[in-house]
């Protein structure tokens, strides 16, 4: 049964949660650019509405799809674990509002509503309409550049494995279980070199490898300038480079599971 709705509408969520014992909260607005109000109203307030709806309908278990970016502090993460604290500042609204959402879900955990948050990193696989299409589109238009020296390693999450982790997390949510009220990184055991993976993907699409390069420092500076310009001119479109994007494309992000 499908019930379309908006996470900003608490009443709709309550109706959808009626008679349900487990909720998987996956909905969010992704992206590296846009007004704070949009990210906050959906990612944070929407999640708070989900928690409220679960309590109203006496749902027993809530699994949140979070993100490793909630603990991203601007520095590389190499074999990082869940001891990483939330940073005090964020480079864009998405990780900030997702952090607030994750914190709300974990704080809500009690004997009536058991909660857990999963942080899958770079989900990819069949029916992807976000990551892979954007990479291929940029490559075909000649706008894809390697940022940094290409040595950065990242943890990835195949979509079916990420889905399985959510089901396993729900099963593990039992009274007194160690996972209750906790957050966990979710990814494949071995990291890969980001730009090597991108070039393999492009080859499968019949495209040449990325040859144009830009240093991480230059990309960061360009991103900072573009963010300022887009802010001043109130441009709604996404800048081709931001500080967050420069860091994500040039730094290692690997996690110990």
Question: What label would you give each PLM region?
Answer:
Residues 96, 100-101, 129-134, 148-172, ...:
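Substrate-positioning beta->alpha
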Residues 45, 49-93:
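Conserved Rossmann-fold NAD(P)-dependent oxidoreductase catalytic core, especially the SDR/UDP-sugar
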Residues 4-45, 53, 73:
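NAD(P)H-binding glycine-rich loop region in Rossmannoid oxidoreductase-like domains
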Residues 172-241:
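Mid/C-terminal beta-alpha module of Rossmann-like enzyme folds, strongest
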Residues 71-72, 92-93, 113-134:
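Flexible, glycine-rich beta-alpha linker
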Residues 194, 244-257:
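Active-site loop of classical SDR/Rossmann-like NAD(P)-dependent oxidoreductases
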Residues 89-119:
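Active-site Tyr-X1-5-Lys
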């Amino acid at each position: 049964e499908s019930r379309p709705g908006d996470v900003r509408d608490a009443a709709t969520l309550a109706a959808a949660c009626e008679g349900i014992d487990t909720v998987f909260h996956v909905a969010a607005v992704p992206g590296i650019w846009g007004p704070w109000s949009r990210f906050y109203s959906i990612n944070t307030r929407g999640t708070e509405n989900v928690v409220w709806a679960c309590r109203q309908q006496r749902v027993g278990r809530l699994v949140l799809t979070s993100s490793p970016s909630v603990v991203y502090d601007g520095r590389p993460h190499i074999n990082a674990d869940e001891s990483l604290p939330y940073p005090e500042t964020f480079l864009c609204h998405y990780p900030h509002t997702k952090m607030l959402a994750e914190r709300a879900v974990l704080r809500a955990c009690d004997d009536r509503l058991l909660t857990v948050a999963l942080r899958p990193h770079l989900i990819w696989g069949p029916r992807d309409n976000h990551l892979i299409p954007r990479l291929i589109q940029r490559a075909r238009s000649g706008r894809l550049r390697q940022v940094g020296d290409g040595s950065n390693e990242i943890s990835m999450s195949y979509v079916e494995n990420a889905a399985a982790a959510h089901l396993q997390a729900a099963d593990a949510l039992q009274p007194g279980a160690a996972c209750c009220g906790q957050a966990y990184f979710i990814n494949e055991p071995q990291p890969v070199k980001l730009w090597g993976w991108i070039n393999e993907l492009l080859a499968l699409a019949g495209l040449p490898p990325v040859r144009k390069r830009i240093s991480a420092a230059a990309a960061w500076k360009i991103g900072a300038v573009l963010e300022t310009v887009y802010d001043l001119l109130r441009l709604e479109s996404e800048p081709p480079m931001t500080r967050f994007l420069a860091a994500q494309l040039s730094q290692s992000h690997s996690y110990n599971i």
